[in-house]
Amino acid sequence: MSYVILDLEWNGSYSKVLHKFVNEIIEIGAVKLDDELNVCDTFTMLVAPKIGKKLCSKVKQLTKITNEELKDEGVSFIRAISLFSDFLGDGVLMTWSDSDLHALIENYSYYTGRTRLPFLSRYCNLQSYCEDCLDLHDSSCQLGLGACAEMAGVDFSEDD
């Protein structure tokens, strides 16, 4: 059994086709853990945007991704999701909250016209799981990743 923790970066772009804003995925990042929770592989891929042509300044600042990088190194969403599907295999997909899952479904639907992710058979929202484990059931206040890590004694200081 493997566990794949997914983290997406996206840019808010207005779709003239849908007449609404879309969280267009610009990067897919993931870490694969084995059944003993050891890191066994990583995945990162830039996705060339097709809906929006330029990154908003907040996204550039947060991600450190540039428009030039996306143009030069980004692949199509369909190619990126195909490679990610291969990486995921039969593993359990995990995200912190369900916002990445919603963005993934939204983008998949935009590019394929289908709302069901064919490669997704097992999923876990780690935020909900941790809130249950810590007996935190206040619907007005979601548990943040940093707070959860602190409660679990995880040190985020970077190695030099």
Regions found by a protein language model. Give the residues of each.
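Preference for bulky hydrophobic residues occupying beta-strand positions
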Residues: 6-8, 45
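Short acidic, Gly/Ser-rich segments with clustered Asp/Glu that frequently serve as metal-coordination loops
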Residues: 8-18
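Metal-dependent phosphoesterase signature
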Residues: 60-83
